């Protein structure tokens, strides 16, 4: 994808910095083709594209492709996240989530087909992901931007808004 240099506004910088640091820590050779999704991409869109949005959520969602196609990378992400101060818990829908400082982290994977399959165990990472339809739209059309010492991937705005239009009636 295209690379941009991200200069976030002072108001969003601290929160977005936490999210980007978490992404970098989790993405080190483990979450192949993972990207930040959900409302946390909006401050990035605002800085890069001038799209205005008032961030009101502390949910941090990462879309993941479940494994590198040539080798299963084993890593205890549950341990990694909890070592960063997050507490893991199982939501009412059975999805594993992590919480700290008002943030709630969740992993989302593409769900092919139309039926609900519950949570998706990802044994090689010691966690589970919530399978949702049409996540592949977000993962297939993404942008990478520089942030501080690292970079972060997120859906291209066109893909993000198309995804919202498709899932809104559901």
Map each language-model feature to its residues.
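Compositionally biased terminal segments of proteins
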Residues: 1-170
């Amino acid at each position: 994808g295209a690379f941009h240099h991200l200069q976030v506004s002072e108001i969003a910088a601290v929160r977005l910095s936490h999210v980007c640091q978490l992404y970098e820590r989790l993405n080190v050779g483990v979450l192949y083709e993972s990207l930040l999704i959900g409302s946390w991409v909006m401050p990035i869109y605002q800085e890069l594209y001038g799209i205005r949005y008032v961030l009101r959520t502390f949910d941090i969602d990462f879309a993941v492709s479940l494994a590198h196609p040539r080798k299963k990378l084993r890593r205890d992400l549950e341990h990694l996240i909890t070592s960063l101060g997050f507490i893991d818990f199982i939501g009412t829908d059975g999805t594993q989530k992590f919480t700290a400082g008002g943030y709630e982290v969740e992993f989302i994977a593409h769900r092919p087909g139309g039926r609900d399959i519950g949570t998706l165990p990802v044994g090689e990472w010691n966690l589970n992901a919530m399978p949702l339809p049409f996540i592949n739209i977000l993962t297939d059309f993404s942008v990478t931007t520089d942030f501080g010492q690292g970079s972060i991937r997120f859906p291209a705005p066109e893909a993000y808004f198309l995804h919202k239009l498709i899932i809104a009636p559901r």
